[in-house]
Curated annotation (Swiss-Prot):
PANTHER family: ACTIVATING MOLECULE IN BECN1-REGULATED AUTOPHAGY PROTEIN 1
Regions of compositional bias (Polar residues) in chain numbering: 249-258, 350-361, 443-454, 473-490, 754-768, 1129-1142, 1241-1252
Localization of this protein: Endoplasmic reticulum; Cytoplasm, Cytoskeleton; Cytoplasmic vesicle, Autophagosome; Mitochondrion
Protein name per its UniProtKB record: Activating molecule in BECN1-regulated autophagy protein 1B
Oligomer and partners: Component of the DCX(AMBRA1) E3 ubiquitin ligase complex.
Gene: ambra1b
Length: 1360
């Protein structure tokens, strides 16, 4: 802020002369911002239609002329900032819009997301586009990219990337578990970086696991089915990541070899593009819809794969320009989905260039060219076309090749519909769906990373044909059987999904290997273990994908080099079950017999499914018959090829993924294997159940993430310290389920018996497969069937494992590992449910009126802020909780709980206080986003849990904190502080780094007892324009600076301001004036002042009391919010502040004048209602009236001027109905005005009017000053000694009265030294009572001022 020349006059004059000063514009804007801080603020309530009950969020248009507000009535209102008129009502959301944002560069484009899971993009010129999340999960946050046609959507634990010209998002990334919900997304002003806020699993996992419906995976499945509309896509990405990881983990070279198989274009139509159910255009892209293109992953569907291959063939990348071109079309055109679809296929996405350029790096998960990813418009042809259009697709191809070269070959995931290339995630687990990628470079797995079991939906790998029920679409990369209608209904598809999910996990487990071993040796040998086969077959069958995908990928069904990639990916997630066979040191596809597993390394997977055979169809068929699908897959593959690739086996010895082929007989074995899976699982769908169980088990198997081999030896509940996070979660799940499912187990066990019988039968039918018991037996060894049942966890169960890098053993559960033993963990990590429950209880209790914001802040949930480089449009690896962490723990309530400055250099957010054991405290922290000190905490300020909204001013010099009401006890007040404004002044200065400026006050009706809370408070985007906030009462209030109350930025003003912001109730001595509320004080004060001035008769004595303590005792007060403890910040209106400032100035001036013996003491405004006369409250309480009695013909102003000129003031104190007058020189009753008056001491600026105040000058005398408050202030400011007649009293009396009203409060607050009642009360009738202790200070002047003019004051009036 320090600039060479801060003189605005010089800058402006130089500008007129044409001189250009570097930074002059910014300097002027800063001056404006600083200047307005001293101005009086005027609030304007916007008249909104329908009188909404609550206002949630505010967003400003790029031209700074419009503000959008979301309301509980499900509407969004667009208001003109300058006029305060509501211009548009956006109606259509079925539930409350929780977030809203304007496009930063396209005028008139607004995006909103509601609690019903609907995202709408509105063109204010007409038209809108909408997309629904799967299962209608609430939309937590939205963010437009400033330059690309890209909208980021945060919902649940997923981050979707949507080009709204398409029917649904083209990419999705997931966190490592469902507990790690994404709460906020934000681009920096240039779109170079992306900020994400994600729940720290450690905070909630233990306590919130219970929140997860752990009923069973079935529940999840059913839910998924019910959510059919919601595309499985996001789950698919998880799989994709998983697959990527696998393939990348496996020798990339093999993947390269295989990845290259030409993708076949066919199937594009069947593939649902991205699988996001486009509610509006599903028909348009039925096939394409099947294509799911995730984040930087290419669509896995055959079409996409084919197109990718084409792309590869046509390496031409989309032009960066294309990529940069965001279709900025605003208006309906931007929203016409169909055209956009075609257009999308035609036009490269903003991201295409990135991908085409970087596609080769498997490390980068870039967004495939948006358009490329999903040529929605054209189905097969579009894919075919896409290659040309979307050379970026080449990226996928190159990824495959380069990735392989890198050893991270992108995995060409064969969705049933086709092969998709999935670039290996940049970080194994981070980008996609949580697939916590396990790195299997050696075939050894680190702890498995789980996406939550719930991920299962998406788990059906594209390769998986879980969608079989659903034709090609289901298989396409994101498609999950559950999402497919057919699939949904088809338990097989469900279990396929589950299996896919589980398979990832299982792959990690030796157990699977053991299961395989029973047939495992065979498997490797060429016979699939029943378990393996089952897993693979069920998964594979469901997803003929791996085989057929590979084949489809190949186009031949012959082993394509890609298959390994596909398979590894699919295998892992879909293929289920690559199991690592320690004996063979290979990852083997469980359930598949790999006759030549070793012989055919990953690259050679000949997918049994005919290449580009409609894998979807095969998948569908298989899906239809859960039992059949393993067989079918095997059969189909065997039929297609003598050997069907059962799966990839990772050969640790060779360090490569090897294809395992299933013998034609595999089908039977697979069936048996499936049976094997099912037999023990008491789930409705044995597969589902077994999968659930296995998923849990699998997470448990590698109890020691570092020692898979020993995992089987571990007890079911091994030492948590040895558990990988996934295993740990699984263990907890199992425990939880064991508690919850006792009833469930009975029915499940019955089912299990039935399943076992049926499976036994199937086994007998398929002797070739290893007895299911054997395969299950391995698991059985680890756990008993009952346990297994318990293990079953819903897909949604929070089994997610932290990303690979995060291994947090016991800290979740064991208090000894917690940072502190307090009830409230800063990080909320405690595994003790009591912590969260206590927090919730306290939150509810402290809120009183049910402010959820406060409750959530008291609760121990915290979020991590991660800062992602988005310059290359790389997908953020949000599944990795350890990378790019900017703020490890913070509090997020809504999109207003975090703010990035307009210049992109500062980030303001609330963080938990240090571990004090109580969550009732938080800290406002401002971090640097500058590259040289990224993440450095510059400013801090302590607040309570009611601080929920933060906004940085346009110039980044001030920060406003919005406050939710948390008070339990209410008292009437006309002014309610809803926000506080601070100045950022000293980096690294601790609590002094931020200085309190003023309070934002919400005017309330005196009879309103409901406290007001702010949901969102924002600075208007233009410097000096003001601010706006939305309240829980439905108000949208715009506050603007209207005029200056003081002549300059006088430091005294600042102090005064703070003084006057003190709570009206004087805290001096901690005594509260009896019975008067601030609102009452204000009214009485104003009336008293007016009466005193003679402007209007007053029947009752004014209730304003003022003390004349010479020393202003500045009291730090929490401005009604527990948060503020600095200088008193009053919840009084800003205008009050201004007045107070003025009064302060006068006071200070008066101090100056004190030097002038003749100056009257600053008079303390005091008019107090009789009740307030209590000396306990104030030493002197008087109703001050103008010097002359109201009856005099002289008007009040001239009277005041005359009195001031005379060097003494006469004050009329009215009590009851009697009026007494005291001259400045004579102190009546103990009105004490100390000779030494500090700036803030005289609350009434008016005091300055008098000549130097006599030490004993009664506050009452000050009354006249009070009346003149403003004039006095002016005079004080302008002239020298208050005594000087020259002091102008320019301010209107009304203003004075306002000031006076303020000053009494201030006085009482400021003057800590009030004379004891008795002392002050003994008025000396004709003379000053120096005895007044405060007066004593002024003795020297007091005599001189004691004019016997003062009238006899009735003792009773001031009597002790």
């Amino acid at each position: 802020m320090a600039v060479q020349n801060r003189n605005s006059v010089l800058i402006l004059s130089g500008r007129e002369r044409g001189a250009r000063m570097l930074g002059s514009q910014r300097l002027l804007q800063q001056l404006v911002e600083d200047r307005t801080r001293w101005m009086k603020w005027q609030s304007q309530k916007v008249e909104l239609p329908d009188n909404p009950r609550s206002t949630f969020l505010l967003a400003f248009s790029p031209d700074r002329n419009l503000v959008a507000s979301t309301h509980v009535n499900h509407n969004i209102y667009i208001t003109d900032v300058k006029t305060g008129k509501c211009l548009h009502s956006l109606v259509g959301h079925r539930r409350t819009p929780w977030c809203v944002t304007f496009h930063p560069t396209i005028p008139g484009l607004v995006a909103s997301g509601c609690l019903d899971g609907e995202v709408r993009i509105w063109d204010l010129h007409g038209g809108s586009e909408s997309w629904f999340t799967e299962s209608n999960v609430a939309i937590a946050s939205l963010a437009f990219h400033p330059t690309a046609q890209l909208l980021l959507i945060a919902t649940n634990n997923e981050l979707h990337f949507w080009d709204w010209s398409r029917p649904e998002p083209f990419a999705v990334v997931k966190t490592a578990s469902e507990t790690e919900r994404v709460r906020l997304v934000r681009f920096d002003p240039l779109g170079h970086n992306l900020l994400t806020a994600i729940v720290n699993p450690s905070n909630q996992q233990n306590e919130d696991d219970s929140e997860v419906p752990m009923d069973s995976m079935e529940m999840a499945l059913f839910r998924q089915r019910s959510l059919l509309r919601s595309p499985p896509v996001r789950r698919t990405p998880i799989l994709h990541n998983f697959l990527h990881i696998l393939s990348s983990r496996s020798s990339g070279a093999q993947a390269n070899d295989q990845s290259r198989p030409a993708p076949e274009p066919r199937e594009p139509p069947s593939i649902p593009r991205f699988q996001y159910p486009v509610r509006t255009e599903p028909a348009d892209r039925p096939a394409l819809q099947g294509c799911t293109q995730h984040l930087g992953l290419g669509c896995l569907c055959s079409r996409c794969a084919a197109s990718r291959n084409l792309f590869t063939q046509n390496p031409t990348g989309l032009q960066p320009s294309d990529s940069t071109q965001p279709q900025t079309q605003s208006g309906p055109s931007a929203f016409s989905p169909a055209p956009s679809q075609t257009r999308t296929s035609d036009r490269p996405s903003a991201f295409s260039s990135v991908f085409s350029g970087t596609a080769g790096n498997s490390a980068h998960r870039g967004l495939l060219p948006l358009r490329t990813i999903d040529p929605l418009g054209s189905q097969v042809p579009s894919h075919l076309e896409a290659p040309g259009r979307l050379p970026g697709a080449d990226w996928s191809g190159s990824l495959l090749s380069t990735g392989h070269e890198h050893g991270l070959g992108a995995i060409g995931v064969e969705t049933s519909s086709g092969r998709g290339v999935v670039p290996p995630p940049r970080t194994s687990s981070s980008s996609m769906d949580l697939l916590s990628l396990r790195r299997f470079p050696d075939g050894s797995s680190s702890s498995p990373i789980y996406t939550s079991a719930t991920e299962g939906r998406g788990l059906v790998l594209p390769g998986t044909e879980p969608n079989r029920g659903r034709p090609n679409d289901g298989t396409s990369s994101g498609h999950h059987p559950f999402y497919d209608n057919t699939q949904r209904n088809n338990p097989a598809s469900i279990r396929n999904v589950l299996q896919c999910n589980l398979s990832r996990y299982f792959m990690e487990y030796e157990r699977m290997q053991e299961l395989e071993r029973p047939g495992g040796s065979r498997e490797v040998a060429g016979g699939p273990g029943p378990m393996q086969e089952l897993l693979t077959s069920s998964m594979d069958a469901e997803r003929p994908g791996p085989s057929h995908n590979g084949s489809s990928h190949t186009g031949n069904g012959g082993a394509v080099a890609t298959p390994s990639q596909n398979h590894p990916n699919r295998c892992r997630s879909c293929h289920n079950l690559l199991t690592f066979n320690h004996d063979t040191q290979r990852w083997e596809r469980s359930g598949q017999t790999s006759s030549s597993s070793s012989s055919q390394e990953g690259p050679s997977w000949p997918l049994s499914v005919p290449p580009f055979e409609d894998p979807g169809q095969t998948a569908r068929v298989e899906a239809q018959a859960p039992e059949m699908r393993p067989m079918e897959l095997g059969e189909a593959s065997s039929g297609l090829q003598g050997q069907q690739p059962m799966g990839l086996v990772y050969n640790q010895e060779t360090g490569q993924w090897e294809s395992v082929y299933r013998q034609p007989t595999v089908s039977a074995s697979s069936e048996a294997a499936e049976d094997a899976l099912n037999p023990e699982v008491p789930v409705d769908n044995p597969d589902e159940d077994s999968l659930r169980r296995r998923l849990l088990e699998s997470s448990l198997f590698p109890f020691s993430r570092y020692d898979m081999s020993s995992s089987r030896d571990h007890p079911i509940y091994p030492d948590p310290a040895r558990l990988s996070p996934a295993a740990y979660y699984a263990q907890r799940m199992i425990q939880y389920l064991s508690r919850r499912e006792s009833i469930r187990q009975r029915s499940l066990q019955n089912r299990l018996r039935t399943l076992s019988n049926s499976q036994a039968d199937s086994q007998s039918n398929n002797p070739s497969s290893v007895p299911p018991e054997a395969s299950d037996g391995d698991y059985e060894d680890i756990e008993e069937p009952g346990d297994r049942t318990r293990h079953r966890m819903p897909r949604n169960a929070r089994m997610s494992a932290p990303s690979l890098g995060r291994f947090v053993p016991r800290r979740f559960l064991l208090p000894e590992y917690l940072p502190y033993a307090g009830l409230f963990h800063e990080r909320g990590q405690s595994g003790l449910a009591t912590h969260s429950s206590i927090n919730r209880v306290l939150a509810g209790a402290s809120i009183g009126d049910g402010q959820s914001a406060v409750a959530s802040n008291i609760a121990n949930t915290t979020y991590r802020l991660q800062w992602w480089d988005f310059t290359k449009f790389d997908l953020p690896e949000i599944s990795n909780a350890t990378v790019n962490v900017l703020v490890p723990h913070c509090k997020i309530y809504n999109d207003a709980s975090c703010d990035i400055s307009a210049d992109g250099q500062l980030l303001a957010v609330f963080i938990p206080s240090s571990q004090r054991g109580f969550a009732d405290e938080g800290i406002l922290a401002v971090y640097s986003l500058a590259p040289h000190n990224l993440g450095e905490m510059l400013y801090t300020k302590r607040f309570g849990p009611n601080a929920i909204s933060v906004s940085l001013s346009p110039m980044g010099c001030y920060v406003m904190v919005g406050l939710a009401s948390r008070r339990i006890l209410l008292h009437p007040t006309t002014d309610h502080m809803v926000a506080q404004v601070f100045r950022l002044q000293q980096p690294h200065g601790g609590e002094t780094s931020i200085r309190m400026m003023f309070n934002v006050v919400y005017p309330m009706a005196p009879d309103q007892r409901r406290h007001v809370s702010i949901n969102s408070a924002r600075w208007l985007p233009e410097p000096g324009m003001g601010l706006a906030y939305g309240t829980n009462k439905g108000d949208l209030v715009i506050c603007r600076p209207v005029d200056f109350r003081s002549d300059g930025d006088n430091p005294s003003d600042l102090n005064a301001d703070s003084l006057f912001t003190i709570n009206s109730s004087s805290r001096t001595r901690g005594v509260e004036r009896p019975g008067t509320s601030r609102s009452g004080w204000r009214f009485d004060r104003d009336m008293g002042l007016m009466n005193a001035i003679g402007l209007q008769p007053r029947q009752a004595a004014p209730s304003v009391t003022s003390q004349g303590t010479q020393t202003p005792v500045v009291r730090l007060q929490n401005a009604e919010t527990q948060t503020e403890r600095e200088l008193p910040s009053a919840s009084t209106f800003q205008n009050t502040h201004t007045t107070s400032r003025h009064t302060v100035q006068t006071a200070s001036t008066s101090t100056e004048r004190h030097t002038h013996p003749e100056m009257t003491h600053t008079l303390v405004q005091a008019s107090v209602s009789e009740g307030s006369l209590n000396r306990t409250n104030l030493p002197a309480t008087y109703h001050v009236e103008s010097a002359a009695e109201p009856g005099t013909g002289e008007d009040a102003l001239s009277r005041i001027r005359r009195l001031m000129a005379e060097g003494g003031m006469t004050a009329v104190v009215q009590r009851e109905r009697s009026t007494t007058m005291a001259s400045m020189g004579g102190f009546g009753n103990n009105i004490v005005v100390s000779h030494r008056i500090h700036r803030g001491s005289q609350t009434s600026v008016r005091t300055a009017q008098g000549g130097n105040p006599t030490p004993e000058m009664p506050a009452g005398l000050g009354v006249s000053t009070l009346f003149h408050t403003e004039p006095l202030v002016d005079s004080l400011e302008a002239p020298g000694p208050s005594g000087s007649s020259g002091a102008p009293l320019p301010t209107p009396f009304t203003n004075r009265s306002e000031f006076a009203g303020v000053s009494p409060m201030v006085e009482s607050d400021l003057f800590g030294d009030r004379q004891p009642d008795d002392v002050q009360r003994r008025p000396s009738r004709g003379g000053l009572n120096m005895s007044n202790h405060s007066n004593n200070n002024n003795n020297d002047h007091s005599n001189s001022y004691s004019e016997s003019r003062s009238r006899d004051y009735p003792d009773d009036l001031y009597g002790r």
